[in-house]
């Protein structure tokens, strides 16, 4: 049984019906086994931060209290759990960023790739950029 580590955009798509990828995210999510999907501190914080950002969420923006409620609803689903950082994550993250050129996504994408690889999870994203990292086999939702 695979454990999946969705990026922030997948979590937003799952939680908000108005998200352009909501249907795709829900169809994927409905195939998961219990404890088959993990939040990490980075995706938790990003989900909360972006849920409350009017520039990102437009008419779907929520209050901080509502963001916590949405997070708790996701976490309360038997398919979802919170994963602590695995041992060895920082070394893997450093290795994945040491020789890369700058991009505004390098730090976060490399962190999620390193987290999934170190924990034995599968990255999940709508972003094909995750396929650029060697030794990973991300699930790109379309």
Ranges and model annotations:
Residues 82-84, 139-142:
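Short acidic-hydrophobic, aromatic-tinged amphipathic segments that line or gate anion-handling sites
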Residues 76-124:
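Active-site neighborhoods of divalent-metal-dependent phosphate/nucleic-acid chemistry enzymes
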Residues 7, 105-106, 127, 142:
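Histidine- and aromatic-rich ligand-binding microenvironments
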Residues 130-136:
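Short loop/helix-cap segments at secondary-structure boundaries that form the rim of catalytic
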Residues 13, 48-49, 72:
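Generic alpha-helical structural context detector
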Residues 1-39, 54-66:
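Short, well-structured N-terminal submotif of metal-dependent ribonuclease cores
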Residues 36, 92-94, 137-138:
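A generic "structured core" feature
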Residues 42-46, 108:
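Short, conserved alpha-helical segments within structured domains
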